[in-house]
Amino acid sequence: MGKKAVCIISGGMDSALSAKIAQEEGYEIIALHFNYGQRTRNKELECFRKITQELNASESYEIDLDFFEQIGASALTDKSIDVPIGGLEEGVPVTYVPFRNGIFLSIAAAIAEKHGAEALFIGVVEEDSSGYPDCRESYIEQMQKAINLGTKDETNIEIKMPLVSLRKSQIVQKAIELGVPLEDTWSCYQAEDAACGVCDSCRLRLRGFEVAGVKDPIAYRK
């Protein structure tokens, strides 16, 4: 039997590349997507399905986590909080979803244990990102310890973060090199028809393409 990896795929560029790297490393892909009440859930799900098909994933999970809307406290899940469009600022932005990656990784670990998967792949980026605390490498390493303490003795899961120290321009270049369908990825926090171009995530993406010297294949409003 070949080795298996659960890949958390949001539909964005980073997670699509992370999953492609897992495939390149010889893992059988178990694709995992979360609908957590985010503003662009429909577009993200559409992109996830296209990416999963391109990866020829052996299994695909679409998990609904409606409780994130009940918790709120994030511009991504609470429509009473505006998505910032003024550029990146210091500190943790209002687009941070409380403990999202911790919850995602816990569910991914349960699926990995079910399938006997050796690895979880997550496309967190620490250096060139929005500054979310649950994207830090040190945090993910501690989650790996907790997961392996809280699962069966024979379960040994490694959480892989292949992009954690890359800049967005390097992610763009690597994605093109590996043939990731960037036209089927979505980064915008607030629009589903054409990307807004002004939220933090759009700015980071556009800057990455600009520095890489490549045109972004998706449509933008401005």
Curated annotation (Swiss-Prot):
Documented EC number(s): 6.3.4.20
Pfam families: QueC
Molecular functions per Gene Ontology: ATP binding; ligase activity, forming carbon-nitrogen bonds; zinc ion binding
Alphabetized InterPro entries for the sequence: QueC (IPR018317), Rossmann-like_a/b/a_fold (IPR014729)
Reaction(s) catalysed by this chain's protein: 7-carboxy-7-deazaguanine + NH4(+) + ATP = 7-cyano-7-deazaguanine + ADP + phosphate + H2O + H(+)
Keywords: ATP-binding, Ligase, Metal-binding, Nucleotide-binding, Queuosine biosynthesis, Zinc
Cofactor binding summary note: Binds 1 zinc ion per subunit.
Cofactor(s) demanded: Zn(2+)
Pathway(s) this gene product operates in, as recorded in its UniProt entry: Purine metabolism; 7-cyano-7-deazaguanine biosynthesis
CDD domains: QueC-like
Chain residues that bind Zn(2+): C188, C196, C199, C202
Function: Catalyzes the ATP-dependent conversion of 7-carboxy-7-deazaguanine (CDG) to 7-cyano-7-deazaguanine (preQ(0)).
Protein name: 7-cyano-7-deazaguanine synthase
Species per Swiss-Prot/TrEMBL record: Sulfurovum sp. (strain NBC37-1)
UniProt gene name: queC
